[in-house]
Amino acid sequence: MEQIVTFGGITIDNVSPDHIQQLYSVKLNGTSNNEEIPTEFPNIIQSVCSCDKHVVELTMDVFKLVDTTENSSCAICRYQENEPCIEHKSSESNTKCPIAQSVSCSHSFHACCISRWLHTKKTCPLCNIEWQLIGANNDSVVIYFDDKNQEFKLSDNLVEDIGRQFGIDMDNYIVCKNKSPVTEYKNSTYALCTRDRHNSQNGQTNLKIICEFDSKTENLFIKYSTTIEELRKLVSQTFDLFKDQVKLIYNNIEISKDFDNLTVFNIGIKNDSNLAVECYKSFTYDMEITNNFMVLYVPDTFNTTNSSNNIQSVVSGSIAWIPQPFIDNVTNKDLRCLLSSLYILVKKVNLNTELIQSVTDRFEKYMELYGMHYRQIKLAKDSLRCLLEMNHFNNKDRMILSCTFYELIDRIQRDNNINKNPLLSSNLICNLILSDKQVNEQTKINWKFLAKDVRITKVFNIYSPLVLTNSVPPLLTLNKNLDVVVFTGKGKDVSLPIILYDTLTNSETDVNAAELGKIVSDKGDLMMVDDRIYEEAIMVCIDTSNSMSKASDFDEDIKLKRSSIIETKNRFYEILKTESHSSPQESDIRQLTNTIIWFITHPNFEDWYRKLYSQELIRSIACFEQKVYPNFAMMLVKYPWFFNKLLTSKKVVVNNTWYSFIRNESNSNYNETKYSKEPLQEFLCPISHEIMEHPVVAKDGFTYEKSNILKWFENKSTSPMTNEKISKKICDNKVLKSIIRDWKENNTVIEQSDKLSVTIKLPDPWNETVIHYNETDNIWDLIYQIYHITGLSHDQYKLTSNYWAIDKSSLIKQISSKIKIHPFEKKMVDVKICDKTYFFGTENTMTVSSFYTVGNLLYKLKSRKYHRYAVWYGLKDSGDGFQRGTILSPHDKLIDYSEMTLEIHSSNRYKTPKGNHLSRLDVVKKLFDAYINRSIAYSFNTAIGLMSFSDKSVLECAISPFYESFREKVNELDTSGATALYECLKDSIENLIEWKNADLENRSKAKLRIICLTDGKDTGLDKFKNTVKHKSQYHNVTIDCILIGSDYDNYLGKIGEKTNGYVFNPSTIKYALDIMELETMISSTNRKTIFYHNTIDEKTIPPIINPTKKLHAKAISPMEIISKTNENTKLSQKLIRVQREIVDVMKNQHPDIDVYINEQDISFWKIVFKGPDSTPYKNGTWLAYIQFTEEYPNIAPNIRFVTPIKHCNINNYGRVCHSILDRNYTPNVKISLILQCIYGLLLNPDVNDPLDTNLAMIYYDANGLYEAQIIDYVNKFALKSREEWNQELAKNQFKNW
């Protein structure tokens, strides 16, 4: 008897079930099987919904008839109750309608009106409460459950009462109204349903389960209605397992596959439940021996695919693919690669019998070449055939193929000294058996050549996610976990443009190609995913120098800025328009008095008094002070006569009261304090013979008033009493000070007067005094008296009472206790002043009081128009002729800046706010954002880098195809420094060259380009200019410049001209954004060589390369082309397909579309579109062309309009934006359908996905501007008739515009 063989060429002597189970540590069907975990659940909860039973039809039974009420009206028809209702009036009936009253809310209505209302509404039209049935209690609810109903009292324990009455666990049920869960109850009817029957939007009926697998814990959020099968699939995706491999255990009971159709609610899974997940690592196998070859495989119990023609059901996640027990070290990542590769293989043979035979034969030869057992070869070949034919492919075939592929790849790798998981190279073997190369039975495979063949043939290449947006599925690619998956199509959502199929979990996901490409590149080798053949590399250079903070100089900005300045200036000078008066109005007397006192007691009064032009001076003061003292400023311009009088005579009378700058202590309104007793001699200062306030003891042993002795010591060093030389040290006499204070309080005499009085503590050397005041006097009046007593200006001290600061607008009589003056420390400081308002500038040092402010300084140094000046400190050069520093507020104290040099500069207080215009850098950021958006939309094979420059150039983002995230970096840029323009251009050229040389295989033909966004004025080193010029020309680097602003370097334009670059200097933001939408700016690959000697103006559209010769070639009708085609002519696959499309277009001819085929080249068509009626295009006809490239039909044909057309989905170069040419294109799409879709754009433009955003933005405007622009283009370019086009194209008389 011949020996039994199995995988790996292993021979088996004994194939009894017990021996096989022991040999492979498996279980076989038909043998005893002791289950350790029970699989039957003790209680299955049945689903219940009672919603249809709780709905009770409302009828007139919920109302009772009552008598009419005078002056009451029906809430529905609004007629009086004692009048006929609207129905009776319309029928001209004179009978009165009965009045029906609700038993729920007691509101009354005409019976006819309420009967009609009940057909659609169940609530009262007045109070909106729900009507109840007669007999129902107001504090109860009726619950319907299954076939039962029960009335319950409304209470806090209602839910518990319901559960107790019906004998159910309320954790499994919810109370519903109209099939929606409720939490607040009122007098009504409700249904009791199980939680799986209704899913609320607020998540009330959803639940969280905690899944644990191999020390991993994940929270899954599902619905109660989720089936066990859906849960099993979700768990498999979460933990990366085969769905059939997932074992779910709940409460120590396995949820077997018998329960897959039940919901999680049915088996009692509750919120926050723990679910144990295990993996079937050992299965119950069937054993089958065919031609003495033994195979163990999982029975076809759960995934029967016999005779199925669905590829996803044939090649998808199933435990049958796991090659256990023969091979143990296979991971899910390995199996994904195998299944994805087989998916592509099945798709490529496409039920082609001849090709299937070729593939299986080659598979057989390679297995023989590497010495695999002939019985295994026979079985594996048959299994592969079943797979490719998708016919009778079962789990036994899955086991055979997974083991055989593993073994064949492993033998090839061992022969090449490769150490890698075999199944991760499944795509290489699939490519090998699909290729048409002859199998050399004498020479084994070179692994390097095998990998190279994959890249050459491209069928089983693992493609970059970035490539997929322009590729035809299916293709192998990587997901975010670097697993091999299959790109199966393009999504409907523009933001998620590709669909990936995970063969292991049998699931599809829509993803963003750019984001996925970035993730994959961050996790692995960039070259592994970036396998595109690049057409162009672009370095975007952004100017961030100081000059970029200036206004853009755009027309709209200039107008806005000018109008904003005028508006702000007018608002600033609005106060000067106030009408002046010679005598004060009654309501202004108090405020005018306050202003006069403020003016007199101002520390700069003497400076104002010395200056000429008092009228203009007063207006200047008003403008300068209006922000802080708006009331004083208003008085200055409203009553200028009073202040002119002060500036000429230093005194003025208001309301019969004189106010003077000249101090007159004898006439001041205050009295010295008097005492009932003579003070003791010890209380008097020996120097002044006055009662002491701050007694101090000197070294001579005598006590003096502190201020007096200090003044004595300024000029002398002897004792005032003994005339002997003494030390100047003194110390406080606190005991005497306390005794004097008590004596004053007990002996002060308050004289009777008609006026009110207040005690005020004056600073040294003045004594405490009593000041008299009138009933209406406020603190400003007190300040005036203090000025005349002490000469202190109003900003040299503060007033307090009981340690609280006093508001200057308060009435004096509101102060209940003694007022104390706290003078600010007065000392003189030197301040360096550099006045830059003069042509040559002046520098000097001023000695000013410590309480002097910036405003006081300007009042002292300038004669008028103080608001036109600003004081700065810390000014330093920051490049581009800019200086940076800190501008001081008029109220900043000069003492804080005594060690610095302050500079006075001219300044506009009414300048336009920054938010009212776009800075040049703001414009650049918007342009960059628009450029990135367009680059993503066009999906050219382009890599982009980002540099910024000010004092130096900085590489912000290296050249990469993952440029979508660059916007975040650009938004962070800010202005500073000079403009090292040419240094940045030099560094950009070097970066581009380095990028190109790093991968010549994919980048050698890539064009190199720089897009420079700048104001164009270089302030860096001139030595780089020639370097940039020579390097850019030598390495063919194109330099495009978009100049923002009115000043730029002409040398930059010359370099752009020499490199076939563009130089734009847009005058409006609209034109600037239009530039970024030019196709030749997005990619220069189709840019026509043309030299501009200056900046490109707004009306010029840079030309694109068109197939000129083919456009001018003779074209004939499809019928003539077909008749001329020679049946014996051999055509390529592309032209055969084109020929079919010609026939299809003839069969499906559109009435407004004419098709012409080039006589000498059927791959070039000319199309004439007639504008649809009832659209702005109705009077026009347009010529377009279709060019079928070599990649057709895998890639959509190139279609462009030749006749200029104004359309938001067609760009300036005639390129059409439609999903059928992009994400919705497949090789099966007919040209006739594409033409119909383009015609459909003329009928209904897609304004949500435009190429011309400006036109799309005005589409919905009712001003007719959208239609006017289109009609203007029609009249300029598209008035040629279809007959004229026919003659031109047939006679080869086509003319360009």
From Swiss-Prot:
Residues 678-750 form the U-box domain. The keyword DNA repair does not apply. A zinc finger (RING-type) spans 74-128. Residues 1133-1279 form the UBC core domain. Gene3D superfamilies: Ubiquitin Conjugating Enzyme, von Willebrand factor, type A domain, Zinc/RING finger domain, C3HC4 (zinc finger). Pfam families: U-box, UQ_con, zf-rbx1. Its EC number is 2.3.2.27, 2.3.2.23. It catalyses: S-ubiquitinyl-[E2 ubiquitin-conjugating enzyme]-L-cysteine + [acceptor protein]-L-lysine = [E2 ubiquitin-conjugating enzyme]-L-cysteine + N(6)-ubiquitinyl-[acceptor protein]-L-lysine; S-ubiquitinyl-[E1 ubiquitin-activating enzyme]-L-cysteine + [E2 ubiquitin-conjugating enzyme]-L-cysteine = [E1 ubiquitin-activating enzyme]-L-cysteine + S-ubiquitinyl-[E2 ubiquitin-conjugating enzyme]-L-cysteine. In the C-terminal section; belongs to the ubiquitin-conjugating enzyme family. This is Probable bifunctional E2/E3 enzyme R795. It comes from Acanthamoeba polyphaga mimivirus (APMV).
